[in-house]
Amino acid sequence: MDLEKYIFMYAKKVNLLNMNKEELLIFFDKLGEKPFRSHQIMRWIYHYYCDDFNYMTNISKSLKERLKQIAEIRAPIIIKEQLSSDGTIKWAMKIDEQQIETVYIPENKRTTLCVSSQIGCPLGCSFCGTAQQGFNRNLNVSEIIGQVWRAAQLINLNKKIKIKNNRFPITNIVFMGMGEPLLNIVNVVSAIRIILDDFGFKLSKRHITLSTAGIVPGIEKLKNMIDIPLAISLHAPNDIIRNKIMPINKKYNINSVLEAARRYSMDTKSNHGRITIEYVLLKNINDDVLHAHQLAKQLQGIPCKINLIPWNPIPNIRYACSSQIRMRAFLKVLLKYNIVTIIRKIRGADINAACGQLTGEVINRINLQYNSL
C-alpha cells in the first residue's frame, strides 16, 4: 500500500523517532526520495535536536510540505523537573495520560542518563518503588529514544550547563530506569542502535549499560542482537532470599541467571566481557558477611565487578538500609576474593531519583503471569 494512502486511511502521522537509519531509508525510498535524505533528517533530529521540518534548511520546500502532512518528530513531554542538592535532575515525562521518569546524573567528566523502558514494571521486586506502581505497557522506540532526545535538547538549551555548540551532552546511558528492558528487547535494541549510529547520538557501545533482573531468554537474545555491557540485578546470594525479594527468581533462579551471564561474558566483547553485578543491601536480609561469602562463591569464574547499593527509602516499603559498618564488612569480604567491588554513591535521594525510587504514574495496570515472561 502507498505510504501516504496508509497514513490518510488511519489518520495518524508517522513518528520519525520510531525509526532507525535502515527504517528511515525505507521510509524515504517509499516517498521516492534519495537515500541521503534519511541521513539529513537524522542529523537535524539527533545532532541539532530539531523537531520542526520548517527549520531544516537543506530540505526542499516540497519535501518539507509533504513531511508535514505525513510525519512528525514527537518526543515525550517533560511535565515536571526536580533538582537534587547534588546536581542530579529527575524529569517526569508524559506518556499518554501516564508518567515515566528519567534521571540525569552529572559528575566531573561524566554525565549519565538513566532511561526507562516500560510504564511501570511487572516483576514485583519487593524493595523497588517502580514495582509498587504495577505495570501498564512497554514503551515504543520513540518513547525510549525520546527520553534521550528530550534530555539532550533541554541540557543544550540550559545556559548554566557548559556544553559545546550542539555537542551531545551525555557520556553514558544506562537502562536502569522504570521497567525490565529485556521484556521490551526489540524496542530497546532499536533505540540503542539509534544512540550508537553516527547519524544518531554517536555514543560508543562501552558507554551504554543494560540492566536486567535476570530474564534468561532475553540475555540469550541480547547477545545475538547487539554487543553492549550487561548488568545483572542479583540482590541475593541464594535462591531462598532471592525468591522472597524477587519473585522472578522462581522462574529463573540464580544458577540459570549466572550461567546466562557467563555465556554472555564469553560471547561478547563489550566491557572486555565483564558483567556488572548489582546488589542492594537490605538490613538483616542479605547483608551478613556469610551472605558475602556465598555471593563470592556464586560468582566464581565469571568476569565481573560488583556494585553494592545502599537501599534508598521508599514509602510503604518496610525495609531498611544496612549500616555503614555492615556495608564495609560486606565489601571487605568480597575484596578478599579479589572481586572488584564498590559501594555505589547515592545520588538524587532527596528527590526520589536514586536506585529503586522511580515510580512515575501508572494507570490501567496489567497483571502479567511469569509463564508469559
Swiss-Prot record:
Q: Where would I find the Radical SAM core domain in this sequence?
A: 107-350
Q: Print the miscellaneous field.
A: Reaction proceeds by a ping-pong mechanism involving intermediate methylation of a conserved cysteine residue.
The terms describing its cellular component in GO are: cytoplasm
UniProt keyword list = 4Fe-4S, Cytoplasm, Disulfide bond, Iron, Iron-sulfur, Metal-binding, Methyltransferase, rRNA processing, S-adenosyl-L-methionine, Transferase, tRNA processing
**Matches recorded under HAMAP family:** RNA_methyltr_RlmN
The catalysed reaction is:
adenosine(2503) in 23S rRNA + 2 reduced [2Fe-2S]-[ferredoxin] + 2 S-adenosyl-L-methionine = 2-methyladenosine(2503) in 23S rRNA + 5'-deoxyadenosine + L-methionine + 2 oxidized [2Fe-2S]-[ferredoxin] + S-adenosyl-L-homocysteine; adenosine(37) in tRNA + 2 reduced [2Fe-2S]-[ferredoxin] + 2 S-adenosyl-L-methionine = 2-methyladenosine(37) in tRNA + 5'-deoxyadenosine + L-methionine + 2 oxidized [2Fe-2S]-[ferredoxin] + S-adenosyl-L-homocysteine
Enzyme class, UniProt record, top EC level: transferase
Q: List the disulfide bonds.
A: 114-355
Protein name, UniProt field: Dual-specificity RNA methyltransferase RlmN
What EC designation does it have?
2.1.1.192
NCBIfam families for this protein: rRNA_mod_RlmN (TIGR00048)
Q: Which Pfam families does this entry report, sorted A to Z? A: Radical_SAM, RlmN_N
Could you tell me which SUPFAM superfamilies the record lists for this protein? Radical SAM enzymes (SSF102114)
Annotated membrane-spanning segments are none
> Which positions in this protein are listed as binding S-adenosyl-L-methionine?
179-180, 211, 233-235, 312
